């Protein structure tokens, strides 16, 4: 499980859609769980055309699901293996992991419940990833910590993902920094996606 977090417009959704597209292009099935309504099939087709890939059937191996609540999001992961459309997915993308949790359980008064539910959700995903050899790509928003920006979900997310990458927008480029190690790469945004 890998988390990509950053401010709005830092390239999280772009990266998530491109990962699903690359999985599809490689002959794998992907499940794209959209919590914010940001999935755009026409953008995927544009990336494929710009890269010289055919678009026929390319989106047939990307299963799209929109979730509007934390319970719906959690239930989808719990039942994924038993459903024909999703059990063969080798990549699961959740864009954005914490959105439904912060919407359903807002404010400091709900922090313990929110973090507990998020912990259960992440633990179930980690178990599914291990048992079914499935990769998870999670996008996340940021909040301001005592010193710098941190991904929403804090230690709960940090402890259960295998890697976290902070994305920062720099003009038409995006810098990805591995947290906490600090190594980074700079990639360009364009018609063909992130290069």
Residue ranges and their predicted role:
Residues 1-79:
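Conserved P-loop
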Residues 7, 22-26, 47-54, 80-83, ...:
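Conserved, well-folded catalytic cores of nucleic-acid-processing
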Residues 28-29, 61, 88-91, 129-138:
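Loop/turn-to-beta-strand initiation segments
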Residues 36-39, 68-73, 98-100, 142-146, ...:
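Conserved nucleotide-binding/hydrolysis micro-motifs of P-loop NTPases
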Residues 44-45, 104-106, 149-150:
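Short amphipathic alpha-helical segments
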Residues 60, 90, 158, 162:
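Conserved acidic residues
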Residues 65-131:
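Phosphate-binding/switch loop-helix module in NTP-utilizing enzymes
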Residues 116, 123, 127-195:
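Phosphate-binding/switch region of NTP-binding enzymes
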